[in-house]
From Swiss-Prot:
<protein>
    <recommendedName>
        <fullName>Uncharacterized protein MPN_511</fullName>
    </recommendedName>
</protein>
<comment type="similarity">
    <text>Belongs to the MG032/MG096/MG288 family.</text>
</comment>
<dbReference type="InterPro" id="IPR004306">
    <property type="entry name" value="DUF237"/>
</dbReference>
<dbReference type="Pfam" id="PF03072">
    <property type="entry name" value="DUF237"/>
</dbReference>
């Protein structure tokens, strides 16, 4: 990271400035696309790990500058960070008011050498199948609970929702580049083509993600399985694959380096 910063300083670019960072990445991609992509993926993983120090969201100026007031795009914490139907989100969020506290977060690299099928003029071809080769996993352990009123519990039971729950919830994200060509070619899926947006100063990147949730309590686990949250491939609507500004994670890492 320090070497990256110092190299671009010699090229008269301050990569802690987002605009200049994107300019540096464009030049780097044109010369060494796979090496640059691997560097971005590494800092994507490290950025996720560093954003949750002591299992809490980073509130530093570096985090606010890199990710904005809304915070990190993926993975988010709590219920908002779990992909599910809007119906279940309403049941657990508005009615049950579920509480989820992060107890641990771990990012594990698969040791695959990241590669990208990218062209400096067009980015990713619209009919390209599986344009990226990389893989890593995010494991988040939550301690959570909720308790419905007796009347709400009776009503919820007909929908398969337990009246109360307390315990651990383990959330795993498997993240890779196995986007099908149908998703890559869709214009309403920003980030599929891996293009730089100079106006917004972003490098949008669409992820292919599997979400896997497990809990120990049988009744709550049955609800998880009924919603397919134990083995959910993010594809459409409320479970649409997340889009991140990949450059923001590297920017975050560089800003954190400045604070040391």
């Amino acid at each position: 990271m320090q070497a990256f910063k110092e190299y671009w300083q010699k090229q008269k670019k301050d990569v802690t400035d987002k605009k200049q960072l994107l300019e540096a990445l464009k030049l780097s991609f044109a010369k060494e696309q796979n090496k640059t992509f691997a560097f971005l993926i590494k800092n994507f993983q490290d950025g996720i790990s560093n954003y949750y120090p002591n299992d809490q969201e980073d509130q530093s100026e570096a985090a606010k500058t890199a990710f904005g007031t809304q915070g990190i795009a993926f993975p988010q914490s709590g219920l908002k960070g779990i992909f599910m139907s809007e119906w279940l989100r309403k049941q657990l969020g508005e009615k049950a008011k579920i509480n989820l506290d992060i107890k641990s977060l771990k990012v594990t690299d698969s040791k695959i050498s990241p590669t990208i099928k990218w062209n400096k003029d067009i980015g990713i071809k619209r009919n390209q199948d599986k344009p990226y080769n990389f893989r890593f996993e995010i494991d988040i352990e939550y301690q959570g609970n909720y308790k419905l009123s007796w009347l709400e519990a009776i009503i919820a039971k007909f929908s398969g929702i337990p009246g109360e729950w307390k315990g651990k919830l383990n959330l795993k994200f498997i993240v890779d580049g196995d986007l099908s060509w149908e998703i890559v070619q869709k214009p309403d899926y920003p980030g599929s083509l891996f293009q730089f947006d100079d106006q917004k100063q972003q490098l949008l990147f669409k992820l292919h993600v599997w979400e896997k949730i497990t809990v120990q309590e049988p009744e709550f686990m049955e609800l998880i399985k009924s919603q397919n949250l134990h083995n959910l491939e993010l594809r459409t609507e409320s479970t649409k694959p997340p889009v991140v500004d990949l450059a923001s994670y590297l920017h975050y890492q560089l800003l954190k380096l400045n604070q040391q």
